[in-house]
Amino acid sequence: MKLPGQEELEAACACENVPVGQLDSGPSSGPCPDDPSDTGSRELGPPEDPPLFLQLNELLGWPQTLEWREMGRWVLFEEKLEVDAGRWSAPHVPTLALPSLQNLRSLLAEGLVLLDCPAQNLLELVEQVTRVESLSPELRGQLQALLLQRPQHHTQTTGSRPCWGPAQSRKAAHNKEAPMQQQCQSPLRQKLPPGAEAGAVLAGELGFLAQPLAAFVRLRDPVWLGPLTEVPLPSRFFCLLLGPPMLGKGYHELGRAAAVLLSDPHFQWSVRRASNLHDLLTALDAFLEEVTVLPPGRWDPTARIPPPRCLPSRHKRPPLHLQKVKGLSVPHRTQAEDRHRNGPLAPSPELQRTGRLFGGLVQDVRRKASWYPSDFSDALHPQCVSAVLYIYLATVTNAITFGGLLGDATDGAQGVLESLLGTAVAGAAFCLMAGQPLTVLSSTGPVLVFERLLFAFCRDYSLDYLPFRLWVGIWVAVFCLALVATEASVLVRYFTRFTEEGFCALISLIFIYDAVGKMLNLAHAYPIQRPGSLAYGCLCQFPGPGGNESQWTRPRPQSRDDLLSVDLGLVNASLLPPHECVQQGGYPRGPGCHTVPDIAFFSLLLFLTSFLFAIALKHMKTSRFFPSVVRKVLSDFSSILAILLGCGLDALLGLAMPKLMVPREFKPTLPGRGWLVPPFGANPWWLSVAAALPALLLSILIFMDQQITAVILNRVEYRLRKGAGFHLDLFCVALLMLLTSVLGLPWYVSATVLSLAHMDSLRRESRACAPGEPHSFLGIREQRLTGLAVFTLTGVSIFLAPVLKFIPMPVLYGIFLYMGVAALSSIQFMKRVQLMLMPAKHQPDLLLLRHVPLSRVHLFTAIQLACLGLLWIIKSTPAAIIFPLMLLGLVGVRKALEWVFSPQELLWLDELMPEEERNVPEKGLEPGHSFSGSDSEDSELMYQPKAPEINISVN
């Protein structure tokens, strides 16, 4: 027997090629192919329980025409039907009156409770719930007919008009033959993951009932109940709340209370496992014990609480009801364990010593070999196209910028061509062989400082720079291979967030400083001209037959102006423009002759436009404008669109803006040298041994730079599935140091900001999410193809000069500023710096401030600021040769902080070092589990201790 409307639904689903038997699997598209665990990250309930869609159908129209109308729905948050406006409200946290919960408990205690009901359709279910002694056969028949009526759903697609409203007629508003195909194509259904189930709550006033009628049913197997719910899902729960007319919104609030109860994951967990009425009431009592009561007069009950940015962890809630249901219990957890709930305290397998020579390298190779085929197949996704375009432009800009700086620092021994070629060769080789192919190799500020010092040393002592540099690179490769052989990479366990944030902040400030500095240099090259200033003038000189530039050499003057010109010999540019001066045989002289005063202003305009536009588009993903698909595209291609906008404005203005300069010929920058560097040149042989001393300092710098970046990229919160490769990465860097030294190319190491930008452009997020729930972070699209494509395009860029020459340099400087600001603003260190400037009453409610006194937080931040300032000063002075030692000194400073801060304070301010982690259980630092209001961990996600604090949002 088919229920009313079931045939229409089957026909509609057949049009979509959706088998009715697959309705219990959610959307026909099935699970997201990007990650089979798409729904696993949702906070809808314990992992073994499917998410539940709940709908409240209210009986309206008594005593005239009775009809069921959908008035509310729940997935994670509540959506109310705005009847007058004809639309759904924004998702919000549901609020209930305490009497409604108490009345609901009384009704359930006296009503009908059916657990594991064997009903297979709506008709059988209705027959079960109406078998009560208080109903006569006539009333039972009327009630069954009423319960079998098709409810009026409010289905509204994006961009369509409301299904009903105050200006529409009742007949049009309540079309009982709504097409079921619209139900199959419901946008809400697309937001529900596979395996989702439904629950229906029916409530209302019924005049022929003398006393309330309550029934709660849990079906043994999820069953499709026809058009009872707007989303065609198999139903698991059914709740009926009917009774005689009463004042107020009694039954409406009772229905909301039942739906809110079922939407609670803990109550739902208990009800799914309840065996009798006592278990059901016990779960309800446990819910009541957790309810927070707001005093009347201090809060507007009609106000809607927006969904929080992040939901509290389920294990933070008291396990009372789990202990009472079937004797189950939840293990006791301390705050120290919760502090590390997203990552184990024990070191990862990549950071455990094997005790064998090159043992860590061998393990990295074995671990990565099994993932190698998927490193290419996982790149077959449109998101990778956006990542390639963005990182390519950022890499090319970085290579050209550092190539120019390197050319200035080495007097042309290396230049832009070597920078582009070296970036392409080293980057592509690293992507093919490395353990973490998401890393972007590039010239970095610290390495550039070392190159400048090394060249100055060779110049002062009349040494051949490139041969001496070759031996430095050889020794660096030897030292790095020794570090790989002895498994020195396990020492990165001592690189805590204190060290990571100091290094990341330094690199970010270098990006910001270089971007602003380039704009100031551009303003100096194209100065702002003010009328009346000396630099504003331009004079035209005319040479005479004897070299006297004051003589007029053209035919005899015929006008008063000509006579004045003959007497002066100099014509002001306002009377004779430079191009006319040349046509007349003169020479324009003066600083203002070839200066366009608008370039500086419009360069600043393009600089700020690209910077602000990239930020605005990146934040578009979380805005309220446009559909989610459009927002995601705009956010993914934010930097590309910002660059295109800058190019469009430049073409529209038509000014001679400085453009991106790419070498047109494939030959070394230094004339007369080949691609292979001679081993000695004019240097004595013993310099090959003496080069070991500067190589030792450079090895420390390379190790710190490479491994700090690797630690940041491989943090637990990024959910990388394929593991890290600390030993293999350092091995590849050592080989590339040898290769680039032999070819006379720049040295390359992991670029922190570019690597994090690469990872952020490959973020994977869940597709199915409840209304009001933000997309959950699923991880990073780990593959090798995007990096390989980026560096291949970088090498081809040498031949793409006709295309790249249209990109204005101020636009690229704006993108550089964007990358630096985004990197700097995303680390917790900057959040704590902001706290130093806020009065205590205006500070956000952070987890950090709940466990650590504010004065201690400020002291920790001040120490970090002092270390950062010292690093910057050393980098900018001739003492920069000891810069690698200062980076290593950050670890020593962090170790010394154990004498200033307690382990519990360091647990929240930073991370514990390996020795401290072993001592945490012994010291008993953390108190027992507390469930007071002050410990409700509801702060923003960015302040969660193990959240991705260093998360560059630059794509």
Curated annotation (Swiss-Prot):
Gene3D superfamilies on file: Helical hairpin bin, Mannitol-specific EII, Chain A
Database matches in InterPro entries: Band3_cytoplasmic_dom (IPR013769), HCO3_transpt-like_TM_dom (IPR011531), HCO3_transpt_euk (IPR003020), Na/HCO3_transpt (IPR003024), PTrfase/Anion_transptr (IPR016152)
Catalytic activity: 2 hydrogencarbonate(out) + chloride(in) + Na(+)(out) = 2 hydrogencarbonate(in) + chloride(out) + Na(+)(in); K(+)(in) + 2 hydrogencarbonate(in) + chloride(out) = K(+)(out) + 2 hydrogencarbonate(out) + chloride(in); Li(+)(in) + 2 hydrogencarbonate(in) + chloride(out) = Li(+)(out) + 2 hydrogencarbonate(out) + chloride(in); Rb(+)(in) + 2 hydrogencarbonate(in) + chloride(out) = Rb(+)(out) + 2 hydrogencarbonate(out) + chloride(in)
Region (Membrane (anion exchange)): 387-955
Superkingdom: Eukaryota
Tissue expression per record: Highly expressed in kidney. Expressed in the outer medulla and the inner medulla in the kidney cortex. Only expressed in beta-intercalated cells.
Region (Disordered): 20-50, 154-190, 331-352, 918-955
Heme recorded as keyword: no
One BP term from GO: regulation of intracellular pH
Keyword DNA damage: no
Membrane topology: Multi-pass membrane protein
Keyword terms, alphabetized: Anion exchange, Antiport, Cell membrane, Glycoprotein, Ion transport, Membrane, Transmembrane, Transmembrane helix, Transport
Glycosylation sites (chain numbering): 548, 572, 951
MF annotations from Gene Ontology: chloride:bicarbonate antiporter activity; sodium:bicarbonate symporter activity
Annotated compartments: Lateral cell membrane; Apical cell membrane; Basolateral cell membrane
Function statement: Electroneutral Cl(-)/HCO3(-) antiporter that favors chloride ion entry and efflux of hydrogencarbonate and sodium ion across the basolateral membrane and may participat in salivary secretion. Also mediates Cl(-)/HCO3(-) exchange activity in the presence of K(+) as well as Cs(+), Li(+), and Rb(+). Does not contribute to Cl(-)/HCO3(-) exchanger in the apical membrane of the upper villous epithelium.
Protein name listed in UniProt: Anion exchange protein 4
Recorded name of the encoding gene: SLC4A9
